[in-house]
A protein has these predicted regions:
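DPxDG-like acidic metal-binding loop motif
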Residues: 1-20
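Buried hydrophobic packing segments
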Residues: 8-12, 29-30, 117, 121
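Catalytic-loop motifs flanking and including active-site residues across diverse enzymes
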Residues: 4-8, 72, 113-117
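Glycine-rich, flexible loop/turn motifs
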Residues: 2, 29, 40, 66-67, ...
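Basic, gly/Ser/Thr/Pro-rich low-complexity segments located predominantly at protein N termini
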Residues: 6, 10, 94-96, 133
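Surface "functional belts" at beta-alpha junctions
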Residues: 19-112, 140, 145-146, 150
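Glycine-rich phosphate-binding/hydrolytic loop that grips phosphoryl groups
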Residues: 107-139
């Protein structure tokens, strides 16, 4: 689905001679909450005990790039020692059972919203932050593996 959506957006961008803007899902997810201080860990469930996550400060500056990680009880312990950490996204369900640090705050039932994506897109538009239509590809943390149909 993502490859098809990106291909359609690139085609429209090229044909209509309009800019292409991308909004990372985890960034849009981080913007779903406002915090006075501390860190935001935006996370998406990646099956089993794995999540895709990125870390942002209270001003939404990315402090750790997106990565795939296997959750353990020791995950994020260094960060939790120094500040309150707000975990947001559908990866929270599995995280809250593992991480019991007093500085961990779990915010459930938040998904990236169209409102936040529009606001982030508008900010990129105003700052002329556009993708190169010829070279833009969706960002995958794992290699795509096509599975042949069983029919």
């Amino acid at each position: 689905g993502l490859r098809i959506g990106v291909s359609a957006a690139k085609g429209l961008s090229y044909a209509l001679n309009i800019p292409l803007i991308s909004v990372p899902t985890l960034e849009a997810l981080a913007h779903q909450i406002e915090i006075p201080k501390g860190a935001i860990v935006a996370m998406l469930d990646a099956r089993r005990m794995e999540v895709y996550s990125a870390i942002y400060d209270a001003n939404y500056n990315e402090t750790r790039a997106t990565e795939a990680e296997v959750l353990t009880p020791d995950s994020y312990q260094e960060l939790l020692k120094s500040s309150i950490v707000y975990f947001v996204g559908n990866g929270v369900a599995k995280t809250k059972d593992l991480i019991t640090h007093k500085n961990a705050q779990f915010i459930e039932d938040k998904l990236p919203s169209a409102k936040q994506m529009c606001a982030l897109s508008y900010r990129k538009f105003k700052s002329n932050t556009f993708e190169d239509v010829a070279y833009f590809e969706p960002y995958y943390l794992k290699d795509f593996i096509a599975i042949p149909s069983k029919k």
